[in-house]
């Protein structure tokens, strides 16, 4: 799990992605995140994107897939601290209409 750091406390799973998310890394990150989510069964999953400077469409797929996974187990899913470059991609994709984004990027509408 070299691309992830995680903390599980008070039924909250915080997963920090380390490095860029592209088609080369997304599969490994997805598999490791799913394992953590299904093993811990948290009520809240926080995906920390503060260390991600680049994300392509594979990253959007990763986010949407983990959102769906969390819905399936009854957990809430939030993105926290996205870097400015990632915030722009999230904004263009309209991700804030599906899930909460805290810190870094905010929907000011």
Stretches found by the model and what they are:
Residues 1-53, 68-109:
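STAS-like cytosolic regulatory interaction modules
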Residues 56:
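ABC-family nucleotide-binding domains
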Residues 63-66:
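Histidine-anchored nucleotide/phosphate-binding helix
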């Amino acid at each position: 799990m070299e691309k992830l750091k995680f903390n599980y406390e008070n039924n909250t799973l915080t997963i920090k992605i380390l490095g860029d998310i592209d088609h080369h890394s997304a599969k490994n990150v997805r598999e490791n995140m799913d394992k953590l989510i299904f093993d811990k069964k948290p009520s809240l999953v926080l995906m920390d994107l503060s260390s991600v400077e680049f994300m392509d469409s594979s990253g959007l797929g990763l986010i949407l897939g983990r959102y769906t996974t969390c819905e399936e187990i009854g957990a809430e899913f939030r993105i926290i601290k996205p870097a400015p470059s990632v915030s722009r991609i999230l904004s263009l994709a309209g991700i804030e209409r599906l899930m909460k984004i805290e810190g870094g990027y905010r929907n000011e509408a």
